[in-house]
From Swiss-Prot:
Similarity field: Belongs to the methyltransferase superfamily. RlmKL family.
NCBIfam families the record matches: PRK11783.1
Subcellular location: Cytoplasm
Region annotation (Disordered) ranges: 395-418
Natural source organism: Pseudomonas putida (strain GB-1)
Lineage, broadest ranks: Bacteria, Pseudomonadati, Pseudomonadota, Gammaproteobacteria, Pseudomonadales
Main location group: cytoplasm
Source domain of life: Bacteria
Protein's name in the database: Ribosomal RNA large subunit methyltransferase K/L
Amino acid sequence: MSDRFELYLTCPKGLEGLLAEEAKGLGLEEVREHTSAIRGAADMETAYRLCVWSRLANRVLLVLKRFSMKNADDLYDGVNAVDWADHLAADGTLAVEFSGHGSGIDNTHFGALKVKDAIVDKLRNREGLRPSVEKIDPDVRVHLRLDRGEAILSLDLSGHSLHQRGYRLQQGAAPLKENLAAAVLIRSGWPRIAAEGGALADPMCGVGTFLVEAAMIAADIAPNLKRERWGFSAWLGHVPALWRKVHDEAQARAQAGLAKPPLWIRGYEADPRLIQPGRNNVERAGLGDWVKIYQGEVSTFEPRPDQNQKGLVISNPPYGERLGDEASLLYLYQNLGERLRQACMGWEAAVFTGAPQLGKRMGIRSHKQYAFWNGALPCKLLLFKVQPDQFVTGERREAQPEGTEVRQQAPQASEPARLSEGAQMFANRLQKNLKQLGKWARREQIDCYRLYDADMPEYALAVDLYQDWVHVQEYAAPRSIDPDKAQARLLDALAAIPQALGISPQRVVLKRRERQSGTRQYERQATEGRFQEVNEGGVKLLVNLTDYLDTGLFLDHRPMRMRIQREAAGKRFLNLFCYTATATVHAAKGGARSTTSVDLSKTYLDWARRNLALNGYSERNRLEQSDVMAWLEGNRDSYDLIFIDPPTFSNSKRMEGVFDVQRDHVQLLDLAMARLAPGGVLYFSNNFRKFQLDEHLMARYAVEEITAQTLDPDFARNNRIHRAWRLQLR
């Protein structure tokens, strides 16, 4: 055989340029790029070196022959003309892979059969024996690629694809192939940063692919050094002495690299199910001293290298599957950008994404972008320098999803209308309440509170402030009240509110509050889709003032949510009838070990998912769409802290029967208490004004009414807004 060969290296689409540069550095000459491949010329030593050292290639193919063909007979004759006794024992095993079509070959399976027949017939006619087919681990794997009438016949020197390094036996739901991860690291400048002694951190590391590939680059470890079976292992053209030379050189370089002080390489992953698989992958790669993986949310990401060195933050955020919708994904990118700006000053950052438009929501300018493909999905690698001059001013406004409202300075009317005497009295009451409650709200870090609740009988309204928006609920007037007078007073109030509070009339939202039947309480009232971000006790929550009767945040339960935040540390939290899971967000903020939230409404669970994502909390917080009673009957888990705030009345196509809180609360609480761990606490609350707790519950459990403790100053005037109890096992 010749001492010089044509080699054909395949790779993921988009890596051709990087692979060409890498292959030249490893000795490949006359390099030319093709779609998802490169080709060049090399001796056998270089071919071996490419196999063991290429971080980017999928396969290294040694071209045996190129020939023209017009039909299947030409294909057979071209393959049969090769002296296969130089490559494969007559009683050996082979596999054939065929790609392309044309020249009478429109079926790759048929093409592969013709190639196989040509090889088998050649050896049988010469040796009297024939090789057998072995698809998994053959002695020789033959490739034939048909391209515009030209057949390229090759031997696969690599065997299994080179991206399969052998360390990643456990992986997450959407893994990044190892050679693609290496390409992203190279494009991100990691070889340069590593050579300078820099650090690397991945805030969403999954099972650690970026971390292991980064450590192998930094420690000068050949990616396929540990591979035991190669495509050339049983090939008759194999030169074992030459291979041992190449392998021994790689082994020596790895030993020297691992003898150096390890770089600081850390990964953080929110999903506890991926932590141990990631650590196992690191150990299989022999990099336990270099790479550490911890459980952590994006919202708390803060790399702290031992020597305070800077480096590279690299991440492959989910493309939508893990979090469920685009809005949740947007908040994830927003959180990532916030953490980079707050905790990674002076670092470089690289975000590999299938949703590049979300990179613009991070509040940092990307100074370089590279196109990649992750399988069939077009992706972008966004590179950032985390420096103040790269920060985008006003990024909070940019980070809102389409249709989301942001705070603005309200336009002032040029000349306010004169108020009636009654309206002026109403305005004066609003201003008095604002002065009293505003100081309290600012001190408690509260954006939303009840400013007025039918304080004056003739103005039967609830007025809630949501930052610089006003949510007004009109209580239905009794039949004894003249409808015209009631309407006039409502119009007076609506005229007074903007003047009294100094906000635009366009920021006043009016709804009518009356007794609801069935599921009407939860039905959509409008379709504006305007979400607003508010703050409460250190957490961010989304409210929608227009589309539903309720806004997504029950203001009267604020003290209960704050109590849950204070008590949640290290506990398993269960939220039943969770609505938009605002209490769950508080529990996560308080350090809950895990949270589970159950509700029948997909709409509100999607909202809950956004609330969690907005705060950087992800899928360790379980959201279950189910009828609560049925879910409790089928659940066998234990919880340390349970919160139940059921509706007064509920029915749905998805549930059997009708839920009535007065009738069904005993069964509900018995089922929930069966899930309460020893020493745990269950909080039960509801808004039914005539509700009476069944006395038998007080005999079975330790029950304490805590209603007075769950009312903040803004609801002190209406101590019947809800009732609340604390229950424990006796």
